[in-house]
């Protein structure tokens, strides 16, 4: 999915449809992606990430970015669409200044639940179907995704159609 998102964002930047992309980049730790603004294809290809740790809601960052010149591309997970719609309803975000792409999400992984299972030193994760493999400094551990899914994700159960 990450590659498709980067490809689409690069195309929209290249043809001038958008001026910037609001997404995620790796934080200090593998389990802590942080919201980021990208203004070039090179920056996207170098630092953009979308994985099972990308739980941050990007909608609130549009309040300021929608006032900037040009359009901002935002990738919206199903649960984030609630807050984006509310910001639009309250006129806190200019609709004409954003380009929205809905992205699928079948739940994000909780770093706290991984730790509760005795796993430390996370370096990355890979997801294959319903199995999440947590790679650490000490080896790999496999989990069923539902066992380490963020509680918020379990409750929402909403998907883009």
Regions found by a protein language model. Name each.
Residues 1-160:
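Iron-sulfur-associated redox domains of electron-transfer enzymes in respiratory
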